[in-house]
UniProtKB/Swiss-Prot annotation:
InterPro entries linked: Ribosomal_bL32, Ribosomal_bL32_bact, Ribosomal_zn-bd
GO MF annotation terms: structural constituent of ribosome
GO biological process, one term: translation
Family: Belongs to the bacterial ribosomal protein bL32 family.
GO CC annotation terms, alphabetical: large ribosomal subunit
Annotated Basic and acidic residues bias: 27-44
Protein source organism: Nitrobacter winogradskyi (strain ATCC 25391 / DSM 10237 / CIP 104748 / NCIMB 11846 / Nb-255)
Protein known as: Large ribosomal subunit protein bL32
NCBIfam families: rpmF_bact
UniProt keyword terms in alphabetical order: Ribonucleoprotein, Ribosomal protein
Residue ranges with Basic residues bias: 1-16
Pfam families xref list: Ribosomal_L32p (PF01783)
Length: 61
């Protein structure tokens, strides 16, 4: 069984764990409707993505 030669230092342990942090999602303001949406995601209310109609817009009913 493999055994580490040296004890992992606190600095190296912290650098390894730095990638585990969870960041809050970013939002971008939609140019047409002015509502917030995720970047690189389509707007589900209007069905638009990059200025093109991709899906049918949700109806209010």
């Amino acid at each position: 069984m493999a055994v580490p030669r040296r004890k992992t230092s606190p600095s190296r342990r912290g650098m390894r764990r730095s990638a585990d942090a969870i960041s809050k999602p970013t939002y971008a303001e939609d140019k047409d409707s002015g509502e917030l949406r995720r970047p690189h995601h389509l707007d589900l209310k209007t069905g638009m993505y990059k200025g093109r109609q991709v899906l049918k817009a949700k109806s209010d009913s």
